[in-house]
Swiss-Prot record:
Role: Stimulates the secretion of gonadotropins.
MF (Gene Ontology): gonadotropin hormone-releasing hormone activity; gonadotropin-releasing hormone receptor binding
Protein's name according to its UniProt entry: Progonadoliberin-2
Signal peptide start-end: 1-23
PROSITE patterns: GNRH
GO cellular component: extracellular space
Coiled coil: none
Residues modified to Glycine amide: 33
Domain of life: Eukaryota
Keywords: Amidation, Cleavage on pair of basic residues, Hormone, Pyrrolidone carboxylic acid, Secreted, Signal
Residues bearing the modification Pyrrolidone carboxylic acid: 24
The keyword Cytoplasm belongs to this UniProt entry's keyword annotation: no
Cellular localisation: Secreted
């Protein structure tokens, strides 16, 4: 019983740590260090992104960490309550 709880706690910490880290992954068209191949985008698309960020509407760049962590905790609590019933 103790070992299974320890494994569950370790898995939960691993998931939360992965969500909270600022690790960079490679995506199509991106290179290490955040450099992007600009040939694949039109200049109008790039300028629109810059205009949106200058206007302060860059909320899509910020991850929603609180909601992810809250959902994980609520799911765990719901499972515990279901086990007790």
């Amino acid at each position: 019983m103790c070992v299974s709880r320890l494994v569950l706690l370790f898995g939960l910490l691993l998931c939360v740590g992965a969500q909270l880290s600022n690790a960079q992954h490679w995506s199509h068209g991106w290179y290490p260090g955040g450099k992007r191949e600009l040939d694949s985008f039109g200049t109008s698309e790039i300028s629109e992104e810059i205009k949106l960020c200058e206007a302060g509407e860059c909320s899509y760049l910020r991850p929603q960490r609180r909601s992810v962590l809250r959902n994980i905790i609520l799911d765990a609590l719901a499972r515990e309550l279901q086990k007790r019933k």
